[in-house]
C-alpha cells in the first residue's frame, strides 16, 4: 500500500474512533481546548486559511503538516469536504506524522 493510501486509511480509522475534528472552526476549538495533537492541511488549502490556523496552533504548541492529499481525497474518506483536519489522539498523530515524513 502506498504512503498516501496509508495516511488516508489512518484518517478513516481516527474518524471511526471519534478522534478527529474536521474543518477550520472545529480545529480552532480543539486547539483551544488542548485536545489537538496534530493539524493536517490539504495540498489545495488556501494560504490564508493555513496561516490563520498555524498562528493559533503555534501558540498552543500543536504540530501542523501540509500533506500532498487534496480536499477531494479527504472528502472520499470523511464524506465531507475539508482542507483542515485535526487529529485528537497522540497515537494516530504520531503514526500519521511518521507517514507524512516518509512521503516527503
Residue ranges and their predicted role:
Residues 37-38, 63-65, 82-85:
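Structural motif
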Residues 71-104:
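C-terminal structural segments of small proteins and small subunits
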Residues 43, 68, 89:
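Short secondary-structure boundary segments
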Residues 14-15, 58-59, 77-80:
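Short glycine-enriched loop/turn motifs at secondary-structure junctions
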